[in-house]
Amino acid sequence: MKYLRICYLVILSFLISSSILAEDTKVSNDNTKFNIYSGMFDFSDNGKRSTLIGFQHQNTDLNRDTFLGNLSPITGFMFTADSAAYLYTGVQAQYSIGALNIIPSFTPGLYNKGDGKDLGHLLEFKSEVQISLNLFQNTQLGLSYNHLSNASLGDKNPGANSYMFNFLKTF
């Protein structure tokens, strides 16, 4: 029941952010991008590192041009081998230099430690940078690094650093 409530909250926040961003839309034929990734959760903590796998969705029809560049809403989730889970929604930008893409993102989300690392709070913030290479017109391969933190909302804030290998496909 707890997970169902968390899912409803994330979907609701995605719908709210989507309606806000829908005012300034950029229409394209390829409007859905999926990112499937796998890597090492909390690689800098020898005691709590764990394998992770995740999925992220981006709808490029909801892009918005801002002073930071072109921003797009993203929603996703990741699980670790220790049964920890993180469900998130936020924004990302994309800056291209030829076939190379630099993609920073920020996503608040809900974290459940499972048998994994206790990050100190249910609400965690993920800041990430991804570097990807265009393999084909609609396919990218990349490497990303992120940091999860509760911004000192909890009594403790150990944070977690992770790296992932990304496969991105646009439909």
Task: Label each PLM-derived region with a short phrase.
Residues 57-59, 79, 93-95, 133, ...:
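Residue-level signature of outer-membrane beta-barrel architecture
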